[in-house]
Amino acid sequence: MFLPRLVRYRTERFIKMVPTRTLRRINHSSRDPIQKQVLALIKANANLNDNDKLKIRKYWSDMADYKSLRKQENSLLESSILHEVKIEDFISFINRTKTSSMTTRGIYRRECLYQCKKNLDLVNQVVSQVSSVRHQKPLTTQLDTMRWCVDDAIGTGDIVMAADLFLLYYRLFTDDKKLDEQYAKKIISVLAYPNPLHDHVHLVKYLQLNSLFESITGGGIKLTRFQLETLSNKALGLSNEAPQLCKAILNKLMNINYSLTNDLKLRDDQVLLAYKSIDENYRRGNVASVYSIWNKIKEHYVSISAHDSRIIYKVFKICTHNRAYRSICSEMFWQLTPEYYCNNPLILPAIIDFITKQDSLTMAKELMQNINRYTLPENHHIVWLNKRCLSSLLRMHLKFNDSNGVDRVLKQITTNFRALSQENYQAIIIHLFKTQNLDHIAKAVKLLDTIPPGQAMLAYGSIINEVVDWKLASKVKFTDNLMALVNDLLTKAHDFDPDHRNSLWNVVSALYIKKLCHYKKRDGKFVANAKKDIDLAKLLYINAAKRSKTYWTKSNCNPFIASSPCDVKLKVNNQNRFTILRNIALSALQIGRTDIFLWACAELYQNGMTIEELKLDWNFILKHQIRNSEFKTNKEIIQDIKKHGVSAVKRYLR
């Protein structure tokens, strides 16, 4: 299955280590075993070139595979070059080249580890002659040796090597089950310091150290608040370059062990870290991640109203706009007290928008009663009469055909703000379109002509969305004439925004892919072009994603009328990437194009979705029994997906 291979590829890329296949391709000038070739390098006492360094790395790779050495009945000590070389030659080579070569510094440190179990005298002889400390205290145990190697590496700024030496020690000596947490924390402290050129490698090393502790002790390394904060900031700094690594780090940090006796505020810091992660995934449109993280932290406080209102708002907004996740909005609405949301100018409009999308008249009546009952007099102007709240109320009254409410809100808007906003125009125009009455549509178009393009861009996007939906539903009497309207709107939008910076163009690109991927069945079979269109959707996405700059003109601003696929130009960025890929993947799954489905999942993975989030997302989208279930924890969700999940998703995303 390709997703695990993808994980390996990206990890290898982040560590920037030489892949095993490269080590195998080393063109050795000698047929001697690699150990003898390294010995020859040391005896020659010459400077190391790149090919020499590859030989040394191959030797290290062989030595780390201690199980293979045992099968060959060779001891670790006998396989070590320090066992074969004259100590004088070894020390001479090390002291001459160690200042300029990190590889040289790696040689003597690793050789000390190889020898430390059975030949501490030799180790001390090496340490006394290469150490920068004048009066080095003799090492008495193999653990002392590991600690000296780590300290020596940190002292010369070889931070990644310090982590590698720690990991190597416990790989070589598997009988030592008591992990040195003190030194692990010491290494993590230096890994946590900002180092832009190596931040990604440092974070991978943290994951490897933490994984070692999880495998042996059952729990990760306990961190201080400083380590938690610096590692999280490092990860967030790589959110664009390496979203999957960022996600892995944040997930670990949100679930690390902490001690109440040592740091009472660490758990609160983890909640703040979860907020940062929600914020990052909200920005990317990764609703599955936002849902999962919120589910982890929602019960941290006695009441969810104790959480940061900005986070509650973002959870409401992203889940409202993704139909499959609206159950969490319903849960939050009933858990929040009316006294809280009726006096919160950020949360109240989000709740109104959710109820409008949910089309629940019962909830709308409950909300309006609560607003009248619980809004404090001093908050009335701040909450009720702010622009966002009035826009949300206008949409709600339009949704439920409350003409009196619409008139009242419009009067308040014009009284307080003198003119309608683009959100207000959008709400009125799209309401007229949704009636599917030709007279009302004509009124909407007439109103649209009176609005400057800068105020009408939101309405343009909503109209095009509506027309595309009608087209997909084969409502010919509307779409035949209105496709000309779409072209007119996009031409006006291009004249106003020739560089296509407005979010309208993100919407247009996503809608074009949605239309392209839509399939129809005739007599139980897919129409002939369904599979070709899904290939075209993939090609258009790839071309748009890799294109650094597009030169927009009137001839390419409307993809819906392009005469050839070559003429279609789309805009793909973090604002619409997830929507486009999910549409492609969903259609591919439904028409049996497993290859395209897996490709789209791989793209989503590379842009920050974990395999667990992909499974959650597809099960929520495809299976109403799962999305409508009431889950208390993420563990319950995982168990339910394992038991009742979509079989195709189980089969493909293993």
From Swiss-Prot:
It is found in: Mitochondrion. One of its GO terms (cellular component) is mitochondrion. Its main location: mitochondrion. It comes from the Eukaryota. GO terms for molecular function: mRNA binding. Keywords: Mitochondrion, mRNA processing. One of its GO terms (biological process) is mRNA processing. Present with 2180 molecules/cell in log phase SD medium. Responsible for conferring a stable 5'-end on cytochrome b mRNA. This is Cytochrome B pre-mRNA-processing protein 1.
